[in-house]
């Protein structure tokens, strides 16, 4: 199963996506949901083909030296395919944002003004070794009335090709244009560069991947970008933190899925808490298979730890590695976060209300937490379904981006002959 688009050039594909976006913008919720159900069913029906293609990508990735974290993100299993299908069906159950009223009023002269949600048009996405993103973005774009042009990278080219074929067949079966979702992976780097310069065809571009990839897209794209930042995520442990909470939260945030962007990368322990918390927390991490990159104070508390480097503090490991630093006080912890954070997610474990409120007020990230695992930064966990990414910028959207964040707005003005005096 392969993509069904017959467009032979990048411009042809962008033009086809633009035309398809016009049809999607006025498609009914029933039509869009029918396509989504078809995608969910198609993913499961084509499981053998998808997994075979994924095996090819994984073998190539190992030959090319992909990191453990990227290989994990690249890997699909029957359970993960079922999870993808289930996630698409969850999107079916969500409220269609298109046409929703944001606000409205009636002027004294009787003119009625309403602001409503409308699709962006064509959403572009550039991402690395994440075939799940192919389904997530396509499904979210479809539900919100957008076409999608996907550049999933060479590492997942075989897998993404089969997945987009499944999506296009579901679109056609639902009476919607198959060109509404396209991959340009076959164009290689030319495709990525073309997508970044496709202003006039593509309305918004969303990069997902490493800090390097995101920075390239942000600096080189002529298309407006919604930045989904890398996750150099921090957890602070203060002197009042409960030991069991500190152990459970840090272990979950690092070891549950270390390749996730919301996994913790640096643990900051206040000096007053170091003697009490370092050994149990680092011991739990070691038992979970985590390599500790410790500063000179933390090193003696973790046999087998290695010395942390300055580069570690700015690294999204995407693996079972974590940096640990002992800092003088909450001031120093917040300053460290300001210096090294990618403004994704930060958390503090504390029983001190003043410290909690200060942390919430002074840390400027998309998601700031008290006494909870950073793994909760996720659209599904937040209760609004799948997300297209975690936005770390301040314009348009910030944090997990669900369906409403894939829309813009327009103003509807209804009059009865009024003119401006």
From Swiss-Prot:
Protein name from the UniProt record: Gamma-glutamyl phosphate reductase
Function as written in the Swiss-Prot or TrEMBL entry: Catalyzes the NADPH-dependent reduction of L-glutamate 5-phosphate into L-glutamate 5-semialdehyde and phosphate. The product spontaneously undergoes cyclization to form 1-pyrroline-5-carboxylate.
Predominant subcellular localization, coarse grouping: cytoplasm
GO MF annotation: an example: glutamate-5-semialdehyde dehydrogenase activity
EC number of this enzyme: 1.2.1.41
UniProt KW Nucleotide-binding keyword: no
Record flagged with keyword Cytoplasm: yes
Pathway: Amino-acid biosynthesis; L-proline biosynthesis; L-glutamate 5-semialdehyde from L-glutamate: step 2/2
Family that this chain belongs to: Belongs to the gamma-glutamyl phosphate reductase family.
């Amino acid at each position: 199963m392969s993509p069904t688009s017959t467009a032979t050039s990048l411009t042809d594909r962008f033009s086809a996506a633009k035309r398809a976006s016009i049809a999607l913008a006025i498609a009914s919720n029933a039509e869009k949901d029918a396509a989504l159900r078809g995608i969910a069913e198609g993913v499961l029906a084509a499981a053998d083909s998808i997994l075979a293609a994924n095996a090819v990508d994984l073998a190539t990735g190992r030959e090319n030296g992909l990191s453990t974290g990227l290989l994990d993100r690249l890997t699909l299993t029957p359970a993960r395919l079922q999870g993808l299908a289930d996630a698409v069906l969850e999107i079916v159950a969500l409220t269609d944002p298109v046409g929703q009223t944001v606000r409205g009023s009636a002027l004294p002269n009787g003119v009625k003004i309403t602001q409503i949600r409308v699709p962006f048009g064509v959403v572009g996405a550039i991402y690395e070794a994440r075939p799940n993103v192919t389904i997530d973005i396509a499904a979210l774009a479809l539900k919100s009335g957008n076409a999608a042009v996907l550049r999933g990278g060479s590492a997942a080219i075989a897998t993404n090709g089969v997945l987009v074929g499944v999506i296009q067949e579901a679109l056609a079966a639902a009476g919607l244009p198959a060109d509404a979702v396209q991959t340009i992976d076959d164009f290689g780097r030319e495709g990525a560069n073309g997508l970044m310069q496709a202003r006039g065809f593509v309305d918004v571009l969303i990069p997902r991947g490493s800090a390097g990839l995101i920075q390239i897209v942000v600096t080189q794209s002529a298309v407006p970008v919604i930045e989904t930042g890398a996750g150099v995520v921090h957890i602070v442990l203060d002197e009042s933190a409960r030991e069991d909470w500190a152990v459970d939260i840090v272990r979950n945030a690092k070891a549950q899925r270390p390749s996730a962007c919301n996994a913790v990368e640096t643990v900051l322990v206040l000096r007053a808490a170091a003697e009490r918390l370092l050994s149990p927390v680092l011991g739990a991490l070691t038992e979970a298979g985590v390599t500790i990159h410790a500063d000179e104070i933390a090193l003696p508390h973790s046999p087998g730890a290695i010395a942390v480097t300055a580069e570690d503090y700015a690294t999204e490991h995407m693996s079972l590695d974590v940096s640990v630093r002992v800092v003088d006080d909450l001031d120093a912890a917040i300053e460290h976060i300001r210096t090294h954070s990618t403004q994704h997610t930060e958390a503090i474990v504390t029983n001190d209300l003043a410290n909690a409120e200060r942390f919430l007020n002074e840390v400027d990230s998309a998601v700031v937490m008290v006494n909870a695992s950073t793994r909760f930064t996720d659209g599904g966990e937040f209760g609004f379904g799948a997300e297209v990414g975690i936005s770390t910028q301040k314009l348009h959207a910030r944090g997990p981006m669900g369906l409403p964040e894939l829309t813009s707005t327009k103003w509807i003005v209804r009059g009865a002959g009024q003119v401006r005096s």
